Amino acid sequence: MVKMIVGLGNPGSKYDNTKHNIGFMAIDTIVKNLDINFTEEKNFKALVGSTFINQEKIYFVKPVTFMNNSGIAVKALLTYYNISIQDLIVIYDDLDMEVGKIRFRQKGSAGGHNGIKSIISHIGTQEFDRIKIGIGRPKQGMTVINHVLGKFDQDDDITIKNTLNKVDNAVNYYLQMKNFEKTMQKYNG
């Protein structure tokens, strides 16, 4: 069995630690604790790291296509490594959830998220597992684009660190249990 866990974000240091890059931040937290290094897979437009957990190959992916084209990298890697859509998890930001909240979902629409729209368009289904991380709504007078491409407020630093650790724990629980539904029950909150 092979699994692929994808964190969404935008490439380049200009986007480091922005709200829209919380998926990249989550992947970075997970792989750091597993001592995995990324290599750039130019053919797939992604940074990819891998390891074995319980005799399963696990790929950790950060597409470098920019958010709105994430589906290009996801589809290419699923096809190349012959990974089932049932073995895909995507981690990304959600405007409609308060900062630091986590929600696990087994399927659903893109909900206005362009990275998820791209993935759905390229793989041809909404039926894949996801972990949404709340980044909150823009403050009065701020545009959505400035909000998602902005950094978290200093007041949110501890919340975000705790959230990333919770996502790390949840992903590791999932990889041990091999059951997304049980992970949802334990970590949705």
UniProtKB/Swiss-Prot annotation:
Q: Which GO terms describe its cellular component?
A: cytoplasm
Q: Which NCBIfam families match?
A: pth
Name of the protein in question: Peptidyl-tRNA hydrolase
EC nos: 3.1.1.29
Subunit (UniProt):
Monomer.
**Which residues are annotated as active site?**
H20 (proton acceptor)
| Described purpose of this protein according to its UniProt entry | Hydrolyzes ribosome-free peptidyl-tRNAs (with 1 or more amino acids incorporated), which drop off the ribosome during protein synthesis, or as a result of ribosome stalling.
Superkingdom of this protein's organism: Bacteria
